[in-house]
Amino acid sequence: MSDDTVGFGVIGLGMGAGRARLATQTAGARLVAVADLDEERGRKASEEHGINWYDDYRRLLDREDIDVIMVMTPSGAHGDFTIEAAKAGKHVISTKPIDVSLERADDMITACREAGVILAVDFEARYMADNVRVKQAVDEGRLGKMVLGEARLKWYRGHDYYEGWHGTWKYDGGGSLINQSIHQIDMLVWLMG
């Protein structure tokens, strides 16, 4: 690379549209290109950021100026994209959860390890200001020794939320437990140690 920035490619422009935008606002990061099957979303991102859009994610993997692939697809598809990106020598940031099956998660970890690339899972709740303050208080011992943690989730979404891939076993895995409660589970692990 001719500069010191890290080149990003984003697969999936549902929630990934926001992550693509963040890549353009992050020091040291450079959004290079995006991939999505939906032409409207692809063209919108391309025009907004002045980058290439592809309807075939493999075009991202072929680019030498992309260092990191952000996988922002339905949860049950994370494995395939991650493994292909690793084989292409790209580091991977996958949105949560890592995948809907432990076997696929293990396959992703193995593929990245064998390729010598980094695999990270995006748990954005860790970066919310209130959560950061609680973590600092825990780490500094201001709350005493943490011995028990509890999380609760009230969850309601209208029927239209579940008309696509959400709520399917293949792509959503376990409904609100895995797709939404994963944040609470991660917070317990992060805060409790």
Regions found by a protein language model. Give the residues of each.
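Rossmann-fold dehydrogenase core element
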Residues: 6, 106-125, 143-151
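Aromatic/hydrophobic pocket-lining residues that form π-stacking "cages" and hydrophobic walls in ligand
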Residues: 42, 81, 108, 133-134
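Short, Asp-centered acidic motifs that coordinate Mg2+ and/or phosphate
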Residues: 33, 68, 148
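Predominantly a Rossmann-like dinucleotide-binding segment in NAD(P)-dependent oxidoreductases
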Residues: 125-193
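Acidic-histidine catalytic/liganding microenvironments
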Residues: 26-28, 63-64, 128
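Beta-loop-alpha module in the N-terminal Rossmann-like domain of NAD(P)-dependent dehydrogenases
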Residues: 49-111
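Histidine-centered divalent metal-coordination motifs
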Residues: 19, 78, 183
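N-terminal Rossmann-like dinucleotide-binding module
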Residues: 1-49
